[in-house]
Curated annotation (Swiss-Prot):
Spans traversing the lipid bilayer: none
Signal peptide: none
Domain of life: Bacteria
Basic and acidic residues bias: start-end ranges: 1-10
A GO cellular component annotation in the UniProt record: cytosolic large ribosomal subunit
Region listing for Disordered, in residue ranges: 1-24
Protein name per UniProt: Large ribosomal subunit protein bL35
Keyword annotations: Ribonucleoprotein, Ribosomal protein
Gene, per the UniProt record: rpmI
């Protein structure tokens, strides 16, 4: 059986944690930042976690993570 391919887009966006979850960046931090509050931008800086319903899909895209 051939090796499974890693989804390269997903590999650049998600990192596996020690407990089996996936870290990702928050959305809404690229442009049009002047109207967003400092507090909102500060909270978007922290790493986000992939939600439970999406874990299986992300795991399938990253078979060797």
């Amino acid at each position: 059986m051939p090796k499974m391919k890693t989804d390269r887009g997903a590999a650049k966006r998600f990192k596996k944690t020690g407990s089996g979850g996936f870290k990702c960046k928050h959305a809404n931090k690229r442009h049009i930042l002047t109207k967003k509050t400092t507090k909102r931008k500060r909270h978007l800086r922290a790493p986000g976690m992939v939600a439970k319903p999406d874990l299986a899909r992300v795991s399938a895209m990253l078979p060797y993570a």
